[in-house]
Amino acid sequence: MARIAGVDLPRDKRVEIALTYLYGVGLSRSQEVLSATGVNPDTRVKDLSDEDVAALRTYIETNYQIEGDLRRWEAMNIKRLADIGTYRGRRHRLGLPVRGQRTRTNARTRRGRRVTVAGKKKAPSKK
């Protein structure tokens, strides 16, 4: 089983697609890695030789920041924004949209599910 950066690649998929299971590697970066290492993109992961896997692993780990390192780098950038008190950092901390989207309506993904507010109760009518 091919294991790169602590992630097991799916055995039955093409290498080009399987590399996208790594955080920080999309289709274009996957194609770039395969052309640089000389591995055929149509090869299935289970058919890769140990040398191919080693070549992919070393190329990716030396040239790109992926998985835990990339997640840590992103988290540190967000934390830095919050620590220096920027508007963006505050929006991140409050869980609101960061890039200027409206929040009066929409923004449900960032704000979470609706919290229903009870309507005003009607006073009992006197008869």
Swiss-Prot record:
Per UniProt, the keywords (alphabetical) are: Ribonucleoprotein, Ribosomal protein, RNA-binding, rRNA-binding, tRNA-binding
InterPro entries found in the cross-reference section: Rbsml_uS13_C (IPR027437), Ribosomal_uS13 (IPR001892), Ribosomal_uS13-like_H2TH (IPR010979), Ribosomal_uS13_bac-type (IPR019980), Ribosomal_uS13_CS (IPR018269)
Q: Gene name? A: rpsM
Residue ranges with Basic residues bias: 101-127
How is this protein named in the record? Small ribosomal subunit protein uS13
**Gene Ontology molecular function, alphabetical:** rRNA binding; structural constituent of ribosome; tRNA binding
Q: Which GO terms describe its biological process?
A: translation
Subunit structure as annotated in this protein's UniProt entry: Part of the 30S ribosomal subunit. Forms a loose heterodimer with protein S19. Forms two bridges to the 50S subunit in the 70S ribosome.
Q: Region entry Disordered: which residue ranges?
A: 97-127
The protein's job, in short, is: Located at the top of the head of the 30S subunit, it contacts several helices of the 16S rRNA. In the 70S ribosome it contacts the 23S rRNA (bridge B1a) and protein L5 of the 50S subunit (bridge B1b), connecting the 2 subunits; these bridges are implicated in subunit movement. Contacts the tRNAs in the A and P-sites.
Q: Which family does it belong to?
A: Belongs to the universal ribosomal protein uS13 family.
Q: Mind telling me which Pfam families this protein's record contains?
A: Ribosomal_S13 (PF00416)
Example of a GO cellular component annotation carried by this entry: cytosol
